[in-house]
UniProtKB/Swiss-Prot annotation:
Superkingdom per UniProt: Bacteria
UniProt enzyme class: transferase
Gene3D superfamilies: 3.40.630.30, Acetylglutamate kinase-like
Molecular-function GO terms, alphabetical: L-glutamate N-acetyltransferase activity
Record-level GO cellular component terms: cytoplasm
Quaternary assembly: Homohexamer.
UniProt KW Transferase keyword: yes
Reaction equation(s) it catalyzes: L-glutamate + acetyl-CoA = N-acetyl-L-glutamate + CoA + H(+)
Protein's recorded name: Amino-acid acetyltransferase
Cell compartments where the protein resides: Cytoplasm
InterPro entries tied to this protein: AceGlu_kinase-like_sf (IPR036393), Acyl_CoA_acyltransferase (IPR016181), Asp/Glu/Uridylate_kinase (IPR001048), GNAT_dom (IPR000182), NAGS_kin (IPR033719), NH2A_AcTrfase (IPR010167)
Length: 441
């Protein structure tokens, strides 16, 4: 009998909204030289090919910093940098070309594999490289001559779009040519950032050793706004980590985000399948830089009925919440506040005012099972409390059968039924025997 995997089925079903959302979008993926040197590089290439098969338009920008440094040391030359940028003299440029050429051939070969026993079976991917970027010299800075290190002068956007429209993966490295026929060594971060901005890409994705950006408590920050990301970058630079791939990418991600790129993602090249987990799951696995949070807390409207019902029905069936019909929800929808993440309602609560007694009831508090160990309940309580104060209410009460201690930890005190508004006392269900807790606003 064949083995059945419900986990596979559920995972695939949950990924469908993201597959549909990403189809036809442009992603710029930055592969640092460190990522290419790792054993998981083959898995990353397979995942990139999978994105292509799902109809995502891909530009892959690769680096070769450690590979170049290795060649230099073999030649008994020390790598030289100024402000995190390589000083590329004529001898170094030759080694840059050698390393970049080797990496490009390796990536192209991997993406061209189509054997029947490989993840790329039947893929037939066209990989295109070319002079899409025109460079110019960096020149002299602080008395330091960068020699053949350069920066972007212009990008041939029309030619890039033509290749993407034809279904090709565009592969670009750190070497670009100039109008004078010279070659220049550019930073991978600059190329990836400017390409994402020029193409108005949906996403800029970078790989580093860490799983993402660490929060103050040591956990991975799921998302950062540009100002928050800048603070993290400043802290990393102050700690002497300016040269790290993650720090360099974050600088570019901040610029891209402020220039119209939807989201920038930082994920680990050490984690197998990190690219797929980041793009096809609700919470991802790394850190994303966004202008606007993927998670919002707002007042509900009539279009949210379905999402709220899906959230509260299991709790109603368990007897935790009092059952509400769709019709009742439609009548009372303006009472509800919800937290939404990627179009999914993950938490909700309602505020029922009793103006005569200057009291309000916080009711129908529900949090999605995946988020119950987070701060979503706290966020809802803060928002409902703020709304109650705006209404001129002086007290807030709840009726609960399961969350007595949670509310007590937040300043609510147990009271008797006679402390409720008269209208609420008349409706109190003595069979349900809900605990009543009240707090002063």
């Amino acid at each position: 009998m064949k083995e059945r995997s419900t986990e596979l089925v559920q995972g695939f079903r949950h990924s469908v909204p993201y597959i549909n959302a990403h189809r036809g979008k442009t992603f710029v993926i930055m592969l640092s030289g460190e990522a290419i040197a790792e054993a998981n590089f083959v898995g990353i290439i397979n995942d990139i090919a999978l994105l292509h098969s799902l109809g995502i338009r891909l530009v892959v920008v690769y680096g070769a910093r450690p590979q170049i440094d290795t060649l230099l040391r073999e030649q008994r030359c020390d790598p030289r940098y100024h402000k995190q940028i390589r000083i590329t003299d004529a001898r170094t440029l030759a080694l840059v070309k050698q390393a970049a050429g080797q990496v490009q051939l390796d990536i192209t070969a991997r993406l061209s594999m189509s054997l029947s026993n490989t993840p790329l079976a039947g893929a037939h991917i066209n990989v295109v490289s070319g002079n899409f970027i025109i460079a110019q010299p960096l020149g002299v800075d602080d008395g330091v001559d960068y020699c053949h290190s350069g920066r972007i002068r212009r990008i041939d956007e029309a030619a890039l779009r033509c290749q993407l429209d034809a279904g090709a993966i565009v592969l670009l490295g750190p070497v670009a040519v100039s109008v004078t026929g010279e070659s220049f060594n550019l930073t991978t971060e600059e190329i990836a950032t400017h390409l994402a901005i020029k193409l108005q890409a949906e996403k800029l994705i970078g790989f580093c050793a860490a799983q993402g950006v660490c929060s103050d408590d040591g956990s991975i920050a799921a998302e950062l706004l540009p100002n928050e990301a800048e603070q993290r970058v400043s802290a990393l630079e102050a700690a002497g980590k300016a040269a790290q791939a993650s720090t360099r990418f974050l600088r570019g991600a901040i610029t891209a985000c402020r220039s119209g790129v939807g989201r920038s993602h930082l994920i680990s090249y050490l984690e197998d399948g990190a690219l797929l987990q980041e793009l096809f799951s609700r919470d991802g696995i790394g850190t994303q830089i966004v202008m606007e949070s993927a998670e919002q807390i707002r007042r509900a409207n009539i279009n949210d009925i379905g999402g709220i019902l899906a959230l509260i029905r299991p709790l109603e069936q368990q007897g935790i919440l009092v059952r509400r019909s769709r019709e009742q929800l439609e009548r009372e929808i303006e009472r509800f506040t919800l937290i939404e993440r990627d179009s999914l309602t993950i938490a909700c609560a309602a505020l029922y005012p009793f103006p005569q007694e200057r009291m309000g009831e916080m009711a129908c508090v529900a949090v999605h099972p995946d988020y119950r160990n987070s701060a979503r309940g706290e966020q809802l309580l803060q928002r409902i409390t703020a709304q109650a104060r705006q209404m001129g209410l002086e007290k807030l009460f709840v009726l609960t059968t399961r969350s007595l201690h949670w509310f007590q930890e937040r300043g609510f005190q147990p009271v008797e039924v006679d402390m409720l508004p008269q209208q609420k006392q008349a409706l109190y269900n003595y069979q349900r025997r809900s605990k009543i807790l009240l707090t002063e606003l």
